From Swiss-Prot:
Entry protein name: Glucosamine-6-phosphate deaminase
Organism encoding this protein: Maridesulfovibrio salexigens (strain ATCC 14822 / DSM 2638 / NCIMB 8403 / VKM B-1763)
Pfam family, any one: Glucosamine_iso
GO biological processes: carbohydrate metabolic process; glucosamine catabolic process; N-acetylglucosamine catabolic process; N-acetylneuraminate catabolic process
GO MF annotations, alphabetized: glucosamine-6-phosphate deaminase activity; identical protein binding
Record keyword Hydrolase present: yes
SUPFAM superfamilies assigned to the protein according to its UniProt record, in alphabetical order: NagB/RpiA/CoA transferase-like
Assigned GO CC terms: cytoplasm
CDD domains reported for this sequence: GlcN6P_deaminase
Site keyed Part of the allosteric site: positions: 149, 156, 158-159, 252
Length: 265
C-alpha cells in the first residue's frame, strides 16, 4: 500500500493522478475508462481540479464511464443532499461526460436488493473499474461500509450508524433526524475488485482512521484497513490526517514518495 503524505489538498493530487491515468489509457467508445467516484467534503477539491484540467484541455471524459459509491435511501434525486444532486452540481455538469456513461445507485428503487445486484452486474459488464476513489469516515468506514462490515461484501443496503448520521448531519442543517437511516453502497469486496483504489483523508478527525489503515492489521471494525489487501491501494492524506502516525512511519513514506508528491504518478 502507498501513502502519499501531503501538506494539504489530497484532492489535487488525486485529480492529477486520475487525469494522467485516463490519458495513458487512451479510452475510446469501444474501450472506455471506468472510474469509481465518491461524494462528501474531501473530494470537492478533486472535482474542482478535474474540472480545471478539463477546461484546460488536459483531460476529456467523453469516453469515461463512472460508477458512484453510494446513495441515501428515500431522498429524491433532486434533493440537495442526494448524491445524484451532489455529483451533477460538483462534477458532471461541468465536464464532457455523456449522460449515458453516468451510473448512480437508485435510492428510491422499489426493490433495493435487485437494484444492488444489477449495479454489480453492470460493473462486471464494463470489465471492472480501473480506479475507485473514496473518502474515509472518522470511524474508518469507506463508502457506507460501516464498522463490522464484511470485507468481502458486495453492493447492498446498509443501516447507517449513529456516528455516521451525526457526522453527515452538517449537510442536513445540523439536524440528525433529517439524515436518512439507510443507504445503498458498494461493498468492500466491490472496491477491492477495482484495479486501483485511492482513499482520500483530510483533517485531524481522520487521523485515527489513517493510523488504523496503515499501522494496524486488517480489521472489519475499520473497513479502510482492507486497503492493505489491495495490490494497488493508495492513501492520500493532508498533514493533519497523519498526526496519529508514528514519526518513523511518516518519515518512511515521505522518503519513498518524495518524487511523487508534486508530480503524481
Amino acid at each position: 500500500m502507498r501513502l502519499i503524505p501531503l501538506k494539504n489538498n489530497p484532492g489535487w493530487w488525486a485529480a492529477r493522478y486520475i487525469a494522467g491515468k485516463i490519458k495513458t489509457f487512451s479510452p475510446s467508445a469501444e474501450n472506455p475508462f471506468v472510474l469509481g467516484l465518491p461524494t462528501g467534503g474531501t473530494p470537492i477539491s478533486m472535482y474542482r481540479e478535474l474540472i480545471n484540467l478539463h477546461r484546460a484541455g488536459e483531460v476529456s471524459f467523453k469516453h469515461v464511464v463512472t460508477f458512484n459509491m453510494d446513495e441515501y435511501v428515500g431522498l429524491p434525486e433532486d434533493h440537495p443532499q442526494s448524491y445524484h444532486y451532489y455529483m451533477h452540481e460538483n462534477f458532471f455538469n461541468h465536464v464532457d461526460i455523456p449522460k449515458e456513461n453516468i451510473n448512480l445507485l437508485d435510492g428510491n428503487a422499489p426493490d433495493p436488493e435487485k437494484e444492488c445486484e444489477a449495479y454489480e452486474q453492470k460493473i462486471i459488464n464494463h470489465g471492472g473499474i480501473q480506479i475507485f476513489v473514496g473518502g474515509v469516515g472518522t470511524d474508518g468506514h469507506i463508502a457506507f461500509n460501516e464498522p463490522a462490515s464484511s470485507l468481502s461484501s458486495r453492493t447492498r443496503i446498509k443501516t447507517l450508524t449513529l456516528e455516521t448520521r451525526m457526522g453527515n448531519s452538517r449537510f442536513f442543517n445540523n439536524n440528525m433526524e433529517e439524515v436518512p437511516k439507510y443507504a445503498l453502497t458498494v461493498g468492500v469486496g466491490t472496491l477491492l475488485d477495482s484495479k486501483e483504489v485511492i482513499i482520500l483523508a483530510s483533517g485531524l478527525n481522520k487521523a485515527l482512521a489513517v493510523s488504523y489503515a496503515v499501522e494496524h492489521g486488517v480489521n472489519h471494525l475499520w473497513t479502510v484497513s482492507a486497503l492493505q489487501l489491495h495490490r494497488k491501494g493508495i492513501l492520500v492524506c493532508d498533514e493533519d490526517a497523519t498526526m496519529e502516525l508514528k514519526v518513523k512511519t511518516l518519515k518512511y513514506f515521505k522518503q519513498i514518495e518524495v518524487d511523487n508528491l508534486q508530480d503524481p504518478k
